[in-house]
């Protein structure tokens, strides 16, 4: 009789949990939608300014492709790497998740390092002309998001040190970091196309 009551209590608790889903992922998605609108505004303004100028970018503010292309490959690859971490935690492999998330954070740091190197070697600054202004604002805003993404990943790694904090059934924080990182990746692909590819052809 007692076992039956306990089983019923467990079932009720499970049903109750299903009635109250974790809204953190939904909150993240709403945040990313708002960020997408901000980036969309920047993209629209950039394209409008480009259409108003016969020569784009203006002479003396050309961009190089070598470092940004390497950076792009690193960031795209990191999206696959972080996904391996999500796969690992779904198999209750916390150590594997940590490994892949460490690698992702390192790749993000290398990306930022490449971005800083590019800034130092471009030969023009934020106020040189309208293209330079767009370039620094857009890539800098994206770089800020990459930095935030690295912090989120490191936060997941830190919290995973607590036994049982993440497992195959409870890994919302891991999933949120992955979703955010994929968002950062997609935004960069658009930026790379606008600022580097389309300005060379």
UniProtKB/Swiss-Prot annotation:
Protein localization: Cell membrane
EC number: 7.1.1.9
Swiss-Prot/TrEMBL catalytic activity: 4 Fe(II)-[cytochrome c] + O2 + 8 H(+)(in) = 4 Fe(III)-[cytochrome c] + 2 H2O + 4 H(+)(out)
Membrane topology (UniProt): Multi-pass membrane protein
UniProt GO cellular component terms: plasma membrane
One Pfam assignment: COX3
Membership in a protein family: Belongs to the cytochrome c oxidase subunit 3 family.
Protein name (record): Cytochrome c oxidase subunit 3
Species: Thermostichus vulcanus
Organism lineage: Bacteria, Bacillati, Cyanobacteriota, Cyanophyceae, Thermostichales
This protein's encoding gene: ctaE
């Amino acid at each position: 009789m007692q076992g039956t009551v306990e089983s019923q209590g467990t079932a009720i608790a499970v049903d109750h949990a299903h009635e109250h889903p974790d809204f953190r992922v939904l909150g993240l998605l709403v945040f990313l939608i708002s960020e997408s609108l901000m980036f969309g505004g920047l993209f629209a303004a950039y394209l409008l300014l480009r259409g108003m100028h016969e020569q784009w970018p203006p002479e003396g503010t050309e961009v190089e492709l070598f470092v940004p292309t390497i950076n792009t490959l690193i960031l795209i690859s990191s999206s696959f790497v972080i996904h391996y971490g999500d796969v690992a935690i779904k198999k209750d492999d916390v150590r594997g998740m940590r490994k892949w998330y460490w690698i992702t954070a390192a790749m993000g740091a290398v990306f930022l390092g490449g971005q800083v190197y590019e800034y130092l070697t471009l030969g023009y600054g934020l106020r040189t002309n309208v293209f330079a202004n767009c370039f620094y604002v857009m890539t800098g805003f994206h770089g800020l998001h990459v930095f935030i993404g690295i912090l989120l990943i490191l936060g997941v790694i830190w919290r995973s040190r607590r036994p049982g904090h993440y497992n195959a059934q409870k890994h919302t924080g891991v999933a949120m970091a992955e979703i955010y990182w994929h968002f950062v990746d997609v935004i960069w692909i658009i930026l790379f196309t606008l600022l580097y590819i389309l300005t060379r052809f």
